[in-house]
Amino acid sequence: MNITHVPEIHRTDKQHTENLRHWRKILGIAPFVSIVFPAIMYFISDEDSFKKSLLLRFITILLPFSYSAVQYAILLHTTPYYTLNLLFLAFAAISILSITALPINEWKGDDSLIFSIVLPSLFIPPTYLLSTSCRLVPGQTAFTDTGINVLIDILILLCPLVSLVLVCKEPEYRLLSAVPFPILILARLLNDRYCPSEKSAPPTAPWRVAILVLILTSAALIYAFMMWTPIAILNGYFGLLHKLRESFLSLRPD
Protein backbone atom coordinates (compact mmCIF):
# COMPACT_ATOMS: atom_id res chain seq x y z
CA MET A 1 0.00 0.00 0.00
CA ASN A 2 2.83 2.40 0.79
CA ILE A 3 4.47 1.70 -2.57
CA THR A 4 1.34 2.63 -4.48
CA HIS A 5 1.30 6.04 -2.82
CA VAL A 6 4.91 6.96 -3.62
CA PRO A 7 4.14 8.50 -7.06
CA GLU A 8 1.34 10.55 -5.50
CA ILE A 9 3.64 11.83 -2.74
CA HIS A 10 6.31 12.63 -5.34
CA ARG A 11 3.80 14.60 -7.40
CA THR A 12 2.64 16.48 -4.31
CA ASP A 13 6.23 17.44 -3.36
CA LYS A 14 6.97 18.48 -6.94
CA GLN A 15 3.83 20.61 -7.08
CA HIS A 16 4.73 22.22 -3.75
CA THR A 17 8.21 23.05 -5.08
CA GLU A 18 6.72 24.54 -8.24
CA ASN A 19 4.28 26.62 -6.19
CA LEU A 20 7.14 27.95 -4.06
CA ARG A 21 9.11 28.81 -7.19
CA HIS A 22 6.16 30.70 -8.68
CA TRP A 23 5.55 32.47 -5.36
CA ARG A 24 9.20 33.59 -5.21
CA LYS A 25 8.93 34.95 -8.75
CA ILE A 26 5.83 36.94 -7.78
CA LEU A 27 7.54 38.33 -4.67
CA GLY A 28 10.61 39.14 -6.76
CA ILE A 29 8.71 41.34 -9.21
CA ALA A 30 6.19 42.70 -6.66
CA PRO A 31 8.37 45.60 -5.38
CA PHE A 32 9.01 46.76 -8.96
CA VAL A 33 5.27 46.75 -9.75
CA SER A 34 4.47 48.39 -6.40
CA ILE A 35 6.56 51.41 -7.36
CA VAL A 36 5.79 51.58 -11.08
CA PHE A 37 2.01 51.06 -10.97
CA PRO A 38 1.20 54.02 -8.66
CA ALA A 39 3.54 56.20 -10.74
CA ILE A 40 1.66 55.21 -13.90
CA MET A 41 -1.67 55.99 -12.21
CA TYR A 42 -0.30 59.41 -11.28
CA PHE A 43 0.79 60.18 -14.84
CA ILE A 44 -2.45 59.04 -16.52
CA SER A 45 -4.77 60.79 -14.03
CA ASP A 46 -5.18 64.47 -13.29
CA GLU A 47 -5.54 66.19 -9.94
CA ASP A 48 -9.32 66.50 -10.20
CA SER A 49 -9.65 62.76 -10.81
CA PHE A 50 -7.77 61.97 -7.61
CA LYS A 51 -9.81 64.56 -5.72
CA LYS A 52 -13.18 63.21 -6.86
CA SER A 53 -12.64 59.45 -7.07
CA LEU A 54 -12.20 57.44 -3.88
CA LEU A 55 -11.80 54.30 -6.01
CA LEU A 56 -8.90 55.82 -7.95
CA ARG A 57 -7.17 56.81 -4.71
CA PHE A 58 -7.68 53.32 -3.32
CA ILE A 59 -6.37 51.55 -6.44
CA THR A 60 -3.32 53.82 -6.55
CA ILE A 61 -2.10 53.04 -3.03
CA LEU A 62 -3.31 49.44 -2.79
CA LEU A 63 -0.31 47.67 -4.35
CA PRO A 64 2.57 49.33 -2.46
CA PHE A 65 0.91 49.19 0.96
CA SER A 66 -0.36 45.63 0.35
CA TYR A 67 3.17 44.57 -0.58
CA SER A 68 4.41 46.08 2.67
CA ALA A 69 1.70 44.43 4.77
CA VAL A 70 2.23 40.99 3.17
CA GLN A 71 6.02 41.06 3.48
CA TYR A 72 5.95 42.02 7.15
CA ALA A 73 3.28 39.40 7.82
CA ILE A 74 5.64 36.81 6.29
CA LEU A 75 8.58 38.11 8.34
CA LEU A 76 6.38 38.07 11.45
CA HIS A 77 5.62 34.41 10.78
CA THR A 78 9.24 33.37 10.16
CA THR A 79 11.21 35.51 12.66
CA PRO A 80 11.81 34.01 16.12
CA TYR A 81 12.75 37.30 17.81
CA TYR A 82 10.02 38.81 20.01
CA THR A 83 11.20 42.42 19.62
CA LEU A 84 11.46 42.17 15.84
CA ASN A 85 8.03 40.54 15.72
CA LEU A 86 6.54 43.53 17.54
CA LEU A 87 8.30 45.83 15.09
CA PHE A 88 7.08 43.91 12.02
CA LEU A 89 3.56 43.75 13.46
CA ALA A 90 3.60 47.54 13.83
CA PHE A 91 4.84 47.98 10.24
CA ALA A 92 2.10 45.69 8.90
CA ALA A 93 -0.54 47.49 10.97
CA ILE A 94 0.61 50.91 9.69
CA SER A 95 0.42 49.61 6.11
CA ILE A 96 -3.12 48.28 6.59
CA LEU A 97 -4.14 51.48 8.38
CA SER A 98 -2.80 53.51 5.45
CA ILE A 99 -4.82 51.46 2.94
CA THR A 100 -7.92 52.23 5.01
CA ALA A 101 -7.29 55.89 5.79
CA LEU A 102 -5.48 57.51 2.86
CA PRO A 103 -8.21 57.00 0.23
CA ILE A 104 -11.06 58.40 2.35
CA ASN A 105 -9.44 61.82 2.55
CA GLU A 106 -9.65 64.10 -0.50
CA TRP A 107 -6.24 64.56 -2.08
CA LYS A 108 -5.39 68.21 -2.60
CA GLY A 109 -2.35 69.98 -3.97
CA ASP A 110 0.64 67.65 -4.02
CA ASP A 111 -1.14 64.84 -2.12
CA SER A 112 -1.47 62.70 -5.25
CA LEU A 113 2.26 63.05 -5.91
CA ILE A 114 3.21 62.34 -2.30
CA PHE A 115 0.98 59.28 -1.86
CA SER A 116 1.53 57.69 -5.27
CA ILE A 117 5.26 58.33 -5.81
CA VAL A 118 7.11 59.74 -2.80
CA LEU A 119 5.73 57.50 -0.01
CA PRO A 120 6.23 54.18 -1.86
CA SER A 121 9.79 55.20 -2.71
CA LEU A 122 10.41 55.66 1.03
CA PHE A 123 9.07 52.48 2.60
CA ILE A 124 9.38 49.82 -0.12
CA PRO A 125 13.24 49.76 -0.34
CA PRO A 126 13.86 48.74 3.32
CA THR A 127 10.92 46.33 3.14
CA TYR A 128 12.45 44.70 0.08
CA LEU A 129 15.90 44.43 1.67
CA LEU A 130 14.57 42.89 4.89
CA SER A 131 12.63 40.26 2.96
CA THR A 132 15.28 39.32 0.38
CA SER A 133 18.74 40.24 1.65
CA CYS A 134 18.66 39.53 5.38
CA ARG A 135 18.58 36.40 7.51
CA LEU A 136 16.73 36.71 10.82
CA VAL A 137 17.43 33.47 12.65
CA PRO A 138 19.44 32.90 15.84
CA GLY A 139 23.17 32.74 15.20
CA GLN A 140 22.80 33.94 11.60
CA THR A 141 21.07 37.29 11.99
CA ALA A 142 22.70 39.57 9.44
CA PHE A 143 22.74 40.95 5.93
CA THR A 144 23.51 37.97 3.66
CA ASP A 145 24.06 39.12 0.07
CA THR A 146 27.41 38.78 -1.66
CA GLY A 147 29.10 39.94 -4.86
CA ILE A 148 27.57 42.70 -6.95
CA ASN A 149 24.30 42.38 -5.01
CA VAL A 150 25.99 44.07 -2.04
CA LEU A 151 26.54 47.23 -4.10
CA ILE A 152 23.00 47.08 -5.51
CA ASP A 153 21.53 46.66 -2.02
CA ILE A 154 23.51 49.59 -0.61
CA LEU A 155 22.19 51.76 -3.45
CA ILE A 156 18.66 50.52 -2.68
CA LEU A 157 19.19 51.45 0.98
CA LEU A 158 20.08 54.98 -0.14
CA CYS A 159 16.88 55.34 -2.22
CA PRO A 160 14.75 56.72 0.67
CA LEU A 161 17.43 59.34 1.37
CA VAL A 162 17.39 60.35 -2.31
CA SER A 163 13.59 60.62 -2.15
CA LEU A 164 13.75 62.85 0.93
CA VAL A 165 16.22 65.15 -0.83
CA LEU A 166 13.99 65.32 -3.91
CA VAL A 167 10.91 66.12 -1.78
CA CYS A 168 12.56 69.43 -0.89
CA LYS A 169 12.96 70.29 -4.57
CA GLU A 170 10.43 71.46 -7.15
CA PRO A 171 7.52 69.07 -7.95
CA GLU A 172 9.08 67.98 -11.24
CA TYR A 173 12.15 66.73 -9.35
CA ARG A 174 9.97 64.75 -6.95
CA LEU A 175 8.89 62.60 -9.87
CA LEU A 176 12.43 61.23 -9.98
CA SER A 177 11.73 59.44 -6.68
CA ALA A 178 10.10 56.65 -8.67
CA VAL A 179 13.13 56.09 -10.93
CA PRO A 180 16.16 54.72 -8.98
CA PHE A 181 14.50 51.84 -7.10
CA PRO A 182 12.82 50.11 -10.11
CA ILE A 183 16.08 50.33 -12.07
CA LEU A 184 18.00 48.74 -9.19
CA ILE A 185 15.35 46.02 -8.81
CA LEU A 186 15.68 45.14 -12.49
CA ALA A 187 19.47 45.08 -12.14
CA ARG A 188 19.13 42.78 -9.14
CA LEU A 189 16.72 40.43 -10.94
CA LEU A 190 18.97 40.23 -14.01
CA ASN A 191 22.03 39.59 -11.86
CA ASP A 192 20.25 36.85 -9.90
CA ARG A 193 19.16 35.21 -13.14
CA TYR A 194 22.39 35.32 -15.13
CA CYS A 195 25.12 35.71 -12.49
CA PRO A 196 23.68 34.26 -9.27
CA SER A 197 25.77 34.66 -6.13
CA GLU A 198 25.57 32.63 -2.94
CA LYS A 199 24.39 33.99 0.38
CA SER A 200 27.03 34.44 3.06
CA ALA A 201 27.45 31.59 5.52
CA PRO A 202 27.86 31.98 9.30
CA PRO A 203 29.72 33.19 11.23
CA THR A 204 28.63 36.61 10.06
CA ALA A 205 31.00 39.56 9.76
CA PRO A 206 30.34 42.66 11.90
CA TRP A 207 29.76 44.82 8.82
CA ARG A 208 26.91 42.52 7.77
CA VAL A 209 25.23 42.96 11.15
CA ALA A 210 25.78 46.73 10.85
CA ILE A 211 24.01 46.84 7.47
CA LEU A 212 21.06 44.90 8.92
CA VAL A 213 20.86 47.41 11.79
CA LEU A 214 20.89 50.27 9.27
CA ILE A 215 18.06 48.66 7.29
CA LEU A 216 15.96 48.11 10.43
CA THR A 217 16.64 51.65 11.67
CA SER A 218 15.70 53.10 8.29
CA ALA A 219 12.46 51.12 8.24
CA ALA A 220 11.58 52.11 11.83
CA LEU A 221 12.11 55.83 11.16
CA ILE A 222 10.14 55.74 7.91
CA TYR A 223 7.14 53.91 9.38
CA ALA A 224 7.18 56.11 12.49
CA PHE A 225 6.96 59.10 10.15
CA MET A 226 4.27 57.46 8.00
CA MET A 227 1.88 56.46 10.77
CA TRP A 228 0.86 60.01 11.70
CA THR A 229 -0.91 60.72 8.42
CA PRO A 230 -3.48 57.87 8.61
CA ILE A 231 -3.93 58.48 12.34
CA ALA A 232 -4.63 62.18 11.71
CA ILE A 233 -7.10 61.33 8.93
CA LEU A 234 -8.98 58.78 11.04
CA ASN A 235 -8.96 61.17 13.98
CA GLY A 236 -10.49 63.87 11.79
CA TYR A 237 -13.26 61.56 10.63
CA PHE A 238 -13.97 59.49 13.72
CA GLY A 239 -12.34 61.34 16.62
CA LEU A 240 -10.03 58.36 17.09
CA LEU A 241 -7.52 60.04 19.39
CA HIS A 242 -10.28 61.53 21.54
CA LYS A 243 -11.88 58.10 21.96
CA LEU A 244 -8.54 56.52 22.85
CA ARG A 245 -7.92 59.25 25.41
CA GLU A 246 -11.35 58.72 26.96
CA SER A 247 -10.76 54.96 27.12
CA PHE A 248 -7.39 55.50 28.79
CA LEU A 249 -8.84 57.92 31.35
CA SER A 250 -11.68 55.52 32.14
CA LEU A 251 -9.13 52.84 33.06
CA ARG A 252 -7.30 55.10 35.52
CA PRO A 253 -8.30 54.78 39.18
CA ASP A 254 -10.05 57.78 40.72
UniProtKB/Swiss-Prot annotation:
Pfam families: DUF2463. InterPro entries: UPF0328. Belongs to the UPF0328 family. This is UPF0328 protein ECU01_0070/ECU01_1540/ECU02_1570/ECU04_0080/ECU08_2100. It comes from Encephalitozoon cuniculi (strain GB-M1).
